[in-house]
């Protein structure tokens, strides 16, 4: 029921407004604009289901790829399936009897050994949610804070890191780092719907959003009810999270705090430890009491820049004469570990892929990672990682040769002596030990790997940073 989310309007004196009038502090022109906006908002669902809006949403979902939901319809099949069901879906939405599909729950590993539950809507639901997001965003986006960088047009993680560095360089080096525990699973539905209703008066749209929020989740074949949280695999989730956490941004702005927020990852920058302590108490109270969110006490704290990381970046002092409170960016240990894990997955011997397919995936990961961390001091660690990665590729080739006789022939073809080739092809050593041995280092050389498409991280880094004059690793 839309009345459940109705919020009373107030005039500039803070008094409730029952009738628009000049005496209540609202001009006739303002009344006309408000009424016009309300009329547009009341008809939002008609815009959501317009053919060009649905087509735009469809193309967006296809471009983002992703896995199938509970109905098993893949991205490849989506265009055909959606065109067949589109008219039926539109009519059901307009009539208010559209039934949403359950969400598929998939557990994905986190860096700390734990798992995160990802809620994946069906591909059809993702198209509809994207269409709603396209119409909701213009209403909320203009009011969002300039210091909110996550999931917003013309905003990105590097801008958030740059703003953080600017704060630190200005002397705000006592950082309140608050970690929200399972934020996406803890979002209060009633609170979120109330915030949306302040801008959206369309009953059908509100009803649709509420159904998506309450859709059950299917985990290991069993359906579970959901009474809070937003599914992380939904196209609507980023916008909904920003709508809720915009209340936090407003509170921090009202109090004059210097902050940076990227989705649910936020930090506040203070001049002194005492100021940081007081700020932490107030903001944690606001999060618990007003937004009904849980704080991860173990991961939260007040930190100095050298003990603080944000979005994969860390900070170290420059130690240059006359550069007090100046820091340079480094890559955090967690980000290095994550890169190595991704490369390890691609080069796992049991992963069914040709050598060329592995190289293509490695290049994609390398370019994305190096572009993101461009401008950091990483050459030394890149060289170590390159040596490890080349051995992983040699291991893949060795495993691909399989039988001892094939291994012997290939080693001879690549320049090994008859005796060495025979001995190594029959060795009892494990594949990883052989990959690091001289026999593969002198046969499957760097030059031969390059001929098959391999490019080292060091070489790519130097291409992206031509000002660095250190020679590439050989």
Segment roles from a protein language model:
Residues 1-83, 87:
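Non-catalytic, polymerase-adjacent accessory regions of viral genome-replication enzymes
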Residues 49-54, 102-104, 111, 213, ...:
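Core structural elements
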Residues 82, 86, 283, 386-393:
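Short amphipathic alpha-helical coiled-coil/interface segments
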Residues 92-107, 111, 143-307:
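Conserved polymerase palm-domain catalytic core
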Residues 117, 225-230, 328, 344-358, ...:
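Short, solvent-exposed helix-loop connector elements
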Residues 214, 290-355, 360, 365-367:
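A conserved non-catalytic segment of reverse transcriptases
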Residues 299-308, 361-365, 382-390, 405-414:
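A glycine-rich phosphate-binding loop feature that marks nucleotide/adenosyl-phosphate handling sites
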Residues 392, 397, 401-474:
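Extended C-terminal regions of large enzymes
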